């Protein structure tokens, strides 16, 4: 049997094995201008070298080990001969003053040495020279460093380098063999519920055909295990290599961890990491990743490979506590260690942004020119529409430009000039803007921002680790975001200006349809599974999350008995803006009171906004309060501890508890209150988003596309919030409960068509009949039990 061959680029090899020093986020990034200047400088230097100089020479060399072959490949910037001797030329463009460089950077020299070894092997040379050429990107001043090596010296050095890499590859292949054996007899860990087998077979078929699938399956079906299990089996069958379980909220990451743990209890060998937000993994009070402010950043790169290798080879599950434990032991940054470890594991559980966000995505997996046999499982996929729009949109505020200019005076005249240029360009747009103004493109602002980025990168490199004011650094990231999104502009974008709160213009690059950008990311892998309890209507989500025409779709009905819950629509009440006032608030408060009086227990009432909630709560407490009913309410900006305390009330309550909450908020999805913890959800209104510039732009955009713009901008997003809120009730086969939809609009055809199939038994009620109807339902439940 042929040995497997692992291919790795020269650059990736040396940057991985030979990295050293500190973590420091104070330097600039490789922006477009620097890359363009670097390419021009390369070509200029190569063009000057004459006919004896060969530019961009492809080289590769395969080393055979007992278990695997490792092929190292890349392109040398130049190979030339001088006085009969071969020389490898490695060119690096920098903003720094090259005259101050005392020696080449170690990884740069190592790259050249790899090329020298391969070239010497090919040409059968006894010795070869290495030339490091450093060029300033602005002045084009050059500095050269030269060294000569014998074939023997290079051979010993190269073999040592490769042996250090081989230990990683050897363990990886041994682990995969063990992993795949563990999957051969792996069975679904539970008795299949209704609908689960349909999801499992649909997901497996999707992965095997390298397609995408949308799975609409209500709460209680067991979507998490029904998607993870077939994905794991597909990896075992060689249909994929890594699973990415993507979520929008922390709670769903925990559910995914539990699913993998259950499969491991049934014999699965699988390495699973959860990527936690940097702020939650940081040992410091403030995430300042530089050696001056963080002990863990100091010398991080000297130790991180040993830390990752030990953690990878001794553990199979990597949650926050495990990562912190090992980071402390090795004195490294836990977040960066986590990202490095992710490359070597079988499954990554993480937030959407680590795959989709152009500023945050995992470059180790999804960088330019990289791809893999990835299986994407996208949980709560309905959230990806708004998250996608957010990730793929950007803006520049003239107020921020002026503030940055003020701060830049002490640092760089070039930056001040570039910022003033952008300020003038934005001021021109400001004169033409009243409420908002749609533009064909960002115009000259794009070029101006590119120049600002170049000046800021230059400044960051020249500072040599000295800190910029935090506000100026934040503006730097804003500029980077703007330029990243500027590159993506197409027919899925609307460029517009609007006036900011401070009276200065804001130029926005608004992604109205994120499907094409999401598709570009998913193309880096093999297949994708979008699943949620609320992917209705499915065509809407397909349009906004995928550009493919061959996606599969599955609709799974609820496995729960309809007789265990009662759904009623209140037809004599409205949440319309035009109807809001004491009379309507009193009617809604009366509905709430009559509902909770019919049976002791815990209820949640969901409102379209905090203001609406507070107005109704005030009326309720003034006119309908009772000793046996306790009310609690959600507040804006609750932290994790406050959220947990709120939810604990539902476990501890013995009387009747009414939680006043906001639709689309932290309590309307992703929480499990089973059994008696929650027996009713009262939903006030249709969840329509507030009218605003972005929503109106969406409506107009989709109207022009020939579809109902109101549906796409308002009705569908609103109905999703309603369905999510309703999904808090009935979480298991044994649960009983009621769902009350309070708004006359729910009785209309436009909304009835959006109800899930299992709501077919929905009834209507009025304020006069609701107590009797709910009373009959609870009586029937008591008699049955």
Language-model region placement:
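Metal-dependent nuclease catalytic cores that hydrolyze phosphodiester bonds in DNA/RNA
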Residues: 1-84
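Mg2+/Mn2+-dependent nuclease catalytic core
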Residues: 61-155
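A substrate-engagement module of RecA-like helicase motors
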Residues: 186-187, 239-348, 356, 424-439, ...
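Walker A/P-loop
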Residues: 208-230
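A contiguous, basic/glycine-rich beta-loop/short-helix subdomain that forms a polymer-engagement track
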Residues: 323-348, 359-366, 458-574, 579, ...
